[in-house]
Amino acid sequence: VRRLVLMGSVGVSFPITKGLDEVWGYQPSLETMRRLMDVFAFNKGLLTDELAEMRYQASIRPGFQESFSAMFPAPRQRWVDNLASNEEDIRALPHESLILHGREDEVIPLAASLKLAELIDRAQLHVFGRCGHWTQIEHAARFARLVNDFLNEADQAAAGDS
């Protein structure tokens, strides 16, 4: 591993958001899927009936709901805490890291990425304004450019070492 890219990442503990609790507590229905998509995206223009239907259909495939609901049963704060890494372990990361986050993210609070950027010595943080949890969708071109440039720098550095 030469570099890390983190997008709307947990990594550190935080009080569970209403949005994350709703995502982890998802019970399949088309209406619930529409509400969840509202939580994921700042740009509501991206939220089409077709997208909601497609995601809903994926969520009702045999075995999906049973597996998903077993991952994060209530009370869910414990799962946020379990997904958090020890701060000393995070500080010890030697890798250059790109952290990407939507300012209006209702699933993972921006404060989580700010904390990661504070802990990781070689971190870069990019915050997308007017953006929810779907940074890779809501700002696709800029997201791809940032990630590609960041990873290509590592490839160029590695090629220079050989």
Regions found by a protein language model. Give the residues of each.
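Active-site acidic short loop of glycosyltransferases
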Residues: V1, P94-H95, R122
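Short beta-strand/loop motif that positions the catalytic acidic residue
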Residues: L93, I99-H101, D105
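Hydrophobic "lid"/C-terminal helical patch
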Residues: F68, F72, L116, F143, ...
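Flexible "cap/lid" loop of the alpha/beta hydrolase fold
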Residues: R2-R35
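Active-site-adjacent alpha-helix of alpha/beta-hydrolase-fold enzymes
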Residues: L114-A123
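Conserved alpha/beta-hydrolase catalytic His-Asp/Glu region
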Residues: Q27-R91
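Conserved alpha/beta-hydrolase "acid-adjacent" motif
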Residues: E106-A112
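Catalytic active-site module of serine/aspartate enzymes centered on a nucleophile-bearing elbow/loop
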Residues: R122-S162
